[in-house]
UniProtKB/Swiss-Prot annotation:
One of its GO terms (biological process) is malate metabolic process. Keywords: Metal-binding, NAD, Oxidoreductase. Its EC number is 1.1.1.38. It comes from Proteus mirabilis (strain HI4320). This is NAD-dependent malic enzyme. GO terms for cellular component: cytosol. It comes from the Bacteria. A divalent metal cation binds at residues 246-247, 270. The lineage of its organism: Bacteria, Pseudomonadati, Pseudomonadota, Gammaproteobacteria, Enterobacterales. The gene is maeA. It catalyses: (S)-malate + NAD(+) = pyruvate + CO2 + NADH; oxaloacetate + H(+) = pyruvate + CO2. GO terms for molecular function: malate dehydrogenase (decarboxylating) (NAD+) activity; metal ion binding; NAD binding; oxaloacetate decarboxylase activity. Divalent metal cations. Prefers magnesium or manganese. SUPFAM superfamilies: Aminoacid dehydrogenase-like, N-terminal domain, NAD(P)-binding Rossmann-fold domains. Homotetramer.
Length: 565
């Protein structure tokens, strides 16, 4: 017997009148039926016409088009989200490719910078250091009781924009919007959180409208103890939640992940999500070329936690294809602002020290100084893949790309830094410098490039291809942890969905219009791997399929029936 989806059953609610209209998760606006208007004391509070959600979407989209500035469009969409969440997600679903860059990167970066200026209405939790004694009470104050996914930031490394203080809240809000729009996770189950530990950004500290704690960032033991107080409070309030760390500074991101990954179900999207989507793209590119990843040589510009996280995932895949750990690491070249990471560089972080090149292997290289530049790496190591996670614009110069193309007929070039203003090279330039031969994937959205009358689609190596599917898979399987194997399976599942890998042509990654189907597929593979790893509580395949469909939320209005508190 086919089970009735939850969305088809009536929802019993105690709210009525203006209070109901002020509740974004429940508000239908003009779509309340005549019966509901009578039952919930709404007559006179709404215009006479009873509309369908399709009619509401049409009006909202017309209003959206009236805004010419992307930031204004972002503010408008956020206002709908804070008024009527079902309408917001139906509108987003109807225009996903067009609106994703507005609700998330690159537009969300500007929204974070101006968060205190454009603030309209509270969403999520602002947990400040001065109120640290009340964290349990703050979590109890959340308007959502059955939270299944939390995205938390401390606002210190927002995209490529640095310290934005509580302005970083725009990132958890945007990320969770994509969990719902792309992964079908009900907005009733999501909670954005910002840990307000101060800010070192003088613009924020000196801004009379800044809404956060006006204090330099706390560090060291104070910081670690505060984060731990938050984590322990979350475990008490929602012990089975999936917690995603987002946009923490390099000095904190990896230590926090390592500290808590075996304590609760958590992952860091900047490290693990970026690595997973990048690896999926590289597996797809290798398949399209009839090769394996173990045959490639990879150079990185940017050796922070994100870059090193990607490198470790690539190494794991190379090892699964037959290389030893030593052989795989010999194919990875990490360059940061001090040059190539080698055993001669002092003060390397632990995760960087695992990715150094030994000096004796570089003895024959032609270099000008001990600080080996990216250009010198390209000339000597002859990489077939170039990945940028530096957060600095224009560092993939014409000389570097042309030098790479000399020894690699079809180089893969991935300038992943975002927002768009921080990209290492623009796709149009890369295509031109390689005579149309480069395979390009970027971190921010770019329009297709036309070169010599041929159109080149530019894949956006966007984490939204990965994390919504991981989230849905974790929730459906009841996974207690996010393991490395689950992330690896997510990468391979994404590669399975690549039009280029399957057909030899077309874009490297699926169209954003297909992202819901991609997320469902990734969720299924992740959930199955959770079973294999022994971290799932749903153990049968049939129950797993049912759980994925049951947990996949659609933006449709439910029939309301009244109940009392």
């Amino acid at each position: 017997m086919e089970l009735e989806h939850e969305s088809k059953r009536p929802l019993y609610i105690p709210y009525a009148g203006p209070i109901l209209l002020e509740f974004p998760l429940l508000n239908k606006g003009s779509a309340f039926s005549e019966e509901e208007r009578s039952t919930f004391n709404l007559h006179g509070l709404l215009p006479e016409a009873v509309e369908t959600i399709e009619e509401q979407v049409e009006r909202a989209y017309r209003q959206y088009l009236d805004f010419k500035n992307d930031n204004d469009k972002h503010i408008y969409l956020r206002n709908i989200q804070d008024t009527n969440e079902t309408l917001f997600y139906r509108l987003l679903e109807s225009h996903l490719t067009e609106m994703m860059p507005i609700i998330y990167t690159p537009t969300v970066g500007e929204a974070c910078e101006h968060f205190s200026d454009i603030y309209r209405r509270a969403r999520g939790l602002f947990i400040s250091y001065p109120n640290r004694a009340n964290i349990d009470d703050m979590l109890q104050n959340a308007t959502k009781q059955n939270v299944k996914v939390i995205v938390v930031t401390d606002g210190e490394r927002i995209l490529g924009l640095g310290d934005q203080g509580i302005g970083g809240m725009g990132i958890p809000i945007g990320k969770l919007s994509l969990y719902t729009a792309c992964g079908g996770i009900s907005p009733a189950y999501t909670l954005p959180v910002v840990l307000d530990v101060g800010t070192n950004n003088p613009q924020r500290l000196n801004d009379p409208l800044y809404m956060g704690w006006r204090h330099p960032r706390i560090t060291g033991d104070e910081y670690n103890e505060f984060v731990d107080e938050f984590i322990q409070a979350v475990k008490r309030r929602w012990p089975n939640v999936l917690l995603q760390f987002e946009d923490f500074a390099q000095k904190n991101a990896m230590p926090l992940l390592n500290r808590y990954r075996d304590e609760l179900c958590c992952f860091n999207d900047d490290i693990q999500g970026t690595a997973a989507v990048t690896l999926g793209s590289l597996i797809a590119a290798s398949r399209a070329a009839g090769r394996q990843l173990k045959d490639q040589t990879v150079a990185f510009l940017g050796a922070g936690s994100a870059g090193c996280g990607i490198a470790e995932q690539i190494i794991a895949q190379m090892k699964s294809e037959g290389l030893s750990d030593e052989q795989a690491r010999a194919r990875i070249f990490m360059v940061d602002r001090f040059g190539l990471l080698t055993d001669k560089l002092p003060n390397l972080l632990d995760f960087q020290s695992k990715l150094i090149q030994k000096s004796e292997t570089l003895a024959d290289w032609q270099t000008e100084t001990d600080a080996i530049s990216l250009l010198e790496v390209v000339k000597n190591a002859k990489p077939t893949i170039l990945i940028g996670v530096s957060g600095q614009a224009g560092l993939f110069t014409e000389e570097i790309i042309r030098e790479m193309h000399k020894h690699c007929e079809r180089p893969t070039v991935m300038p992943l830094s975002n927002p768009t203003s921080r990209v290492e090279a623009r796709p149009e330039d890369i295509i031109n410098w390689t005579d149309g031969q480069a395979l390009v994937a970027t971190g921010s959205p770019f329009a297709p490039v036309t070169y010599k009358e041929k159109v080149y689609p530019i894949a956006q190596c966007n984490n939204s291809y990965i994390f919504p599917g991981i989230g849905l898979g974790v929730i459906a399987s009841g996974a207690k942890r996010v393991t490395d194997a689950m992330l690896m399976v997510a990468s391979r599942a994404l590669a399975d969905c690549s039009p280029m890998a399957k057909e030899g042509d077309g874009p490297l990654l699926p169209l954003l219009a297909d992202i819901q189907q991609v997320s469902r597929y990734i969720a299924k593979q992740v959930a199955k791997e959770a079973q294999v790893q022994g971290v799932a509580t749903v153990t049968s395949d049939s129950a797993l399929e049912e759980a994925i469909e049951r947990n996949y939320w659609e933006p449709e209005y439910r029939i309301y029936k009244r109940t009392s508190f």
